[in-house]
């Protein structure tokens, strides 16, 4: 994965975690959902969106299959940050 994009994803992850109150308000709108799963899903969704957007914005192309696999590894390597 391009190092610039990896750095942006780390910033996005830290920003999203710091927006915890907003995420909790969003989750509170739904009944009978597992908080941790929903919280993780929101964070992964934000990162996924940012991953594709930044590739198009910075590199002017879609990420390759290998870069997407590296993104998945990025998520796996940072899972402990997703826990609430």
What are these regions (language model features)?
Residues 27-34:
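Short, charged, low-complexity loops and linkers
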Residues 17-25, 55, 59, 83:
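Residue-level signal for secondary-structure boundary elements
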Residues 1-27:
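Short terminal alpha-helical segments
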Residues 56-84:
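Charged low-complexity stretches with an acidic bias
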Residues 36-57, 61:
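Acidic, low-complexity, intrinsically disordered interaction modules
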Residues 2-4, 32, 77-81:
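Cystatin/cathelin-like cysteine-protease inhibitor module
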